[in-house]
């Protein structure tokens, strides 16, 4: 059995900024409205989101016998100006950075069977981080942490090992705030979901099609930070 406090201590030692642990159970539709999002076609041509939808909701379908999801946060500097390249892309390639730390954490914990997850595996990094008490899902659908706002990269270890204790989700800090919704120049945010067909980051990150004339890229060529810049939790960083 793994020690929750031991996991968190080692996670910090290998370079993460925060760590939480959740039991490997299915996410609810209210936590992660994936099916509703897909039914509306708000995923655009991100066809891969349709595949393995059940695994995205339940890590036990991703890793047979999974019992714990170890979620880790790596914060990055907020942008100093708007436009051009989004803040996450101005630092080292986060997939490599986060995965390298996850591999080190897995080795230190002695759980070689644990699956390393960072964006490219069919599991929702942000929703599991929320389940593990590291923050909450903002209206812009990103994880908002109390310490670093949404300027964070995420990764997980899904393991068959049980933990001696688990973290609990935090209450939302958004309350009646709608600043991120109002800030989006393309009105891409609605009902706590993103219509990627209206989202600048969809076009400037995936580059699968030209930006439509009615979508304002607002000067961004890689990603977009507009909704994050509007968030009060990001203004205190």
Language model features with spans:
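Iron-sulfur cluster-binding cysteine motifs and their immediate structural context
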Residues: 26, 179-211, 217-237
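Auxiliary alpha/beta "docking" domains used to position bulky ligands
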Residues: 1-173, 216-219
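Long, well-ordered alpha-helical scaffolding segments within enzyme catalytic domains
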Residues: 169-178, 185
């Amino acid at each position: 059995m793994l020690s929750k406090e031991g996991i968190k201590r080692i996670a910090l030692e290998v370079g993460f900024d925060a760590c939480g642990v959740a039991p490997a159970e299915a996410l609810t539709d209210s936590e992660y409205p994936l099916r509703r999002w897909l039914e509306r076609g708000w995923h655009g041509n991100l066809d891969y989101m349709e595949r393995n939808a059940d695994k995205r909701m339940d890590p036990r379908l991703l890793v047979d016998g999974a019992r714990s999801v170890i979620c880790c946060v790596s914060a990055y500097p907020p942008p100093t100006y708007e436009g051009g390249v989004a803040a996450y892309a101005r630092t080292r390639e986060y997939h490599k950075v986060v995965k390298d730390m996850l591999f080190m954490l897995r080795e230190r914990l002695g759980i070689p069977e644990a699956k390393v997850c960072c964006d490219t595996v069919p599991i929702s990094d942000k929703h599991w981080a929320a389940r593990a008490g590291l923050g909450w899902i903002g209206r812009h659908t990103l994880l908002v942490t109390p310490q670093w706002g949404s300027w964070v990269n995420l990764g997980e270890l899904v393991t068959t090992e049980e933990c001696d204790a688990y973290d609990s989700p935090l209450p939302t800090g958004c309350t009646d705030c709608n600043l991120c919704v109002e800030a989006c120049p393309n009105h891409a945010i609605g009902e706590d979901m993103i219509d990627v067909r209206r989202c600048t980051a969809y076009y400037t990150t995936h580059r699968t099609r030209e930006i439509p004339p009615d979508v304002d890229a607002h000067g961004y060529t890689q990603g977009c930070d507009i909704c994050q810049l509007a968030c009060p939790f990001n203004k205190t960083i």
